[in-house]
């Protein structure tokens, strides 16, 4: 992990470990390259759809509520700094 990258704080996940690690890496890349939450989410969604097939949903922000249905084995919720990341596959 580079000096700019922050350690993600995992809150909930049912992802395989290697997929979780890759999502953490991609999320740190997104935070380093984009400042607008929508741009971070867009980058992650496109990368995940390409890597793991459609259809991924990505929510990034400082304050939101959620109640979602997801495919088993394809859900993660974590923080990087003050940003929360809710990422799941459905559909």
Swiss-Prot record:
Pfam families, per the entry: Dynein_light (PF01221)
An MF annotation (GO) of this entry: dynein intermediate chain binding
A single GO cellular-component term on record: peroxisomal importomer complex
Source organism of the structure: Debaryomyces hansenii (strain ATCC 36239 / CBS 767 / BCRC 21394 / JCM 1990 / NBRC 0083 / IGC 2968) (Yeast)
Chief location: cytoplasm
Family the entry assigns: Belongs to the dynein light chain family.
InterPro entries: DLC_sf, Dynein_light_1/2_CS, Dynein_light_chain_typ-1/2
Keyword Protein transport: yes
Protein name from the UniProt record: Dynein light chain 1, cytoplasmic
CDD domains in UniProt: DLC-like_DYNLL1_DYNLL2
Subunit description: Homodimer. Cytoplasmic dynein consists of two catalytic heavy chains (HCs) and a number of non-catalytic subunits which present intermediate chains (ICs), light intermediate chains (LICs) and light chains (LCs). Component of the nuclear pore complex (NPC). NPC constitutes the exclusive means of nucleocytoplasmic transport. NPCs allow the passive diffusion of ions and small molecules and the active, nuclear transport receptor-mediated bidirectional transport of macromolecules such as proteins, RNAs, ribonucleoparticles (RNPs), and ribosomal subunits across the nuclear envelope.
Function: Acts as one of several non-catalytic accessory components of the cytoplasmic dynein complex that are thought to be involved in linking dynein to cargos and to adapter proteins that regulate dynein function. Cytoplasmic dynein 1 acts as a motor for the intracellular retrograde motility of vesicles and organelles along microtubules. May play a role in changing or maintaining the spatial distribution of cytoskeletal structures. Also a component of the nuclear pore complex.
Keywords, alphabetical: Cytoplasm, Cytoskeleton, Dynein, Microtubule, Motor protein, mRNA transport, Nuclear pore complex, Nucleus, Protein transport, Translocation, Transport
Biological processes per GO annotation: establishment of mitotic spindle localization; mRNA transport; nuclear migration along microtubule; nuclear pore complex assembly; protein transport
Compartment(s) of residence: Cytoplasm, Cytoskeleton; Nucleus, Nuclear pore complex
């Amino acid at each position: 992990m580079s000096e700019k990258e922050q350690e993600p704080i995992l809150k909930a996940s049912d992802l395989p470990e290697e997929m979780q690690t890759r999502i953490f890496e991609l999320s740190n890349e997104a935070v380093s390259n984009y400042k607008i939450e929508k741009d971070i989410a867009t980058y992650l969604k496109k990368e995940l759809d390409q890597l793991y097939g459609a259809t991924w949903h990505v929510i990034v922000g400082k304050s939101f509520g959620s109640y979602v249905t997801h495919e088993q084995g394809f859900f993660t919720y974590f923080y990087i700094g003050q940003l929360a990341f809710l990422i799941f596959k459905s559909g």
